[in-house]
């Protein structure tokens, strides 16, 4: 039998509302704010590289923000930020000697990938570190020093942690409610 068009519309609206209430959507909004706000403010105040470094730090810290206790989230986000900061610092100075860069990339790649044996959150921290390793060669800091760029990457991770903490205090039971509703 054919259903009425209003039945289809109400079903789609229910599905849309369920998507908008999901934790995946709220994390996407959180990452969108954490990544876009530093870029916008950096462009606005003519400090593009600082905004970009903060954006990178927030982006590379966000994968370890998965369901679990807030203590584990905090440790994962801070570990991702520290790893991205160290890798960004090392990667910033590896552009000078090719033979040195290849050996350091191999060593860092293995060491960072080895972190993933410690569990799912550790594999996401490892993913952040490997992503930071690859992308550290894509950008050359021109206006600020490499160590400053690395520090702003770490500050971007702290920025994401601050936003995640605020979001957690606004919706402390969001993940549990979604788990029980399924």
Q: What residue spans do the PLM features occupy?
A:
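A transmembrane helix-and-boundary motif of multi-pass membrane transporters/channels
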Residues: 1-182
């Amino acid at each position: 039998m054919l259903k009425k068009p209003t039945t289809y519309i109400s079903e789609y609206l229910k599905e849309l509302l369920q998507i908008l209430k999901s934790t995946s959507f709220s994390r996407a909004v959180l990452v969108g704010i954490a990544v876009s706000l530093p870029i916008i403010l950096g462009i606005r105040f003519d400090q593009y590289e600082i905004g970009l470094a903060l954006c990178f730090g927030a982006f590379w810290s966000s994968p370890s923000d998965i369901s679990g206790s807030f203590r584990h989230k905090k440790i994962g986000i801070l570990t991702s930020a520290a790893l991205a900061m160290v890798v960004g610092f090392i990667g910033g100075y590896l552009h000078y000697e090719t033979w040195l860069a290849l050996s350091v990339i191999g060593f860092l790649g293995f060491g960072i990938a080895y972190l993933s044996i410690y569990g799912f959150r550790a594999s996401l921290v490892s993913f952040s570190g490997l992503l930071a390793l690859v992308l550290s060669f894509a950008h050359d800091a021109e206006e600020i020093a490499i160590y400053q760029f690395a520090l702003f990457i770490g500050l971007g991770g702290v920025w994401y942690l601050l936003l995640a903490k605020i979001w957690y205090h606004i919706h402390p039971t969001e993940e549990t409610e979604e788990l029980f509703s399924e």
